[in-house]
Amino acid sequence: MSLHDFTVKSIDGKDFDLSQLKGKKVIVVNVASECGLTPQYENLQELYDQFGGEKFEIIAFPANDFGAQEPGTNEEINGFCSKNYGVSFPVMSKISVIGDDQHEVYQFLTQQAKNGLGDHEMLWNFQKFLVDENGELVRNVPPQTLPIDESIINWINS
């Protein structure tokens, strides 16, 4: 199993086939509009402006699982991201990243039986998962680590 095996819904409700990411390094991140870490959107966009394209992608999944910090509709979330941070990387429809209704992408990212790397507890909003060109999970990055952290930039460039 790999990240490329999934099809998700974009923020505007269209199918987004993750197999289109083959050959790209990807950061998968759960996001929220009313979180103390929400300014990381700016760093994510900086990263996307610098590296996004043929070799790198960011996929954001809004989730209301931590502190009810993403209460908005998909339309409201999309407007917030565009207006406040000029987000141009793909944002998906709001999902759950924990619990009984955990989305299948996050089941893959957090369960060793599915990702082959390890079990990863979801800690908070803006937790980042680094996925290689083959759709394999390579690293789980804590929420407080900025997207422009040297270790992430080095991974993108490697």
Tell where the protein language model's regions lie, with residue ranges.
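Short, internal strand/loop/helix patches
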Residues: 75-123
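Thiol-based oxidoreductase modules, predominantly thioredoxin-like and allied folds used
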Residues: 55-73, 88-99
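Hydrophobic adenine-recognition pocket in adenosine-nucleotide-binding enzymes
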Residues: 31
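Thiol-/selenol-based redox modules, centered on thioredoxin-like
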Residues: 107, 111-158
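Conserved helix-turn-beta segment immediately C-terminal to the redox Cys motif
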Residues: 24-26, 34, 38-64, 78, ...
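Alpha-helical elements of Rossmann-like donor-binding domains used by nucleotide-donor carbohydrate transfer enzymes
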Residues: 43-46, 76, 104, 108, ...
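N-terminal "domain-start" segment that seeds a small globular fold
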Residues: 1-19, 38-39, 104
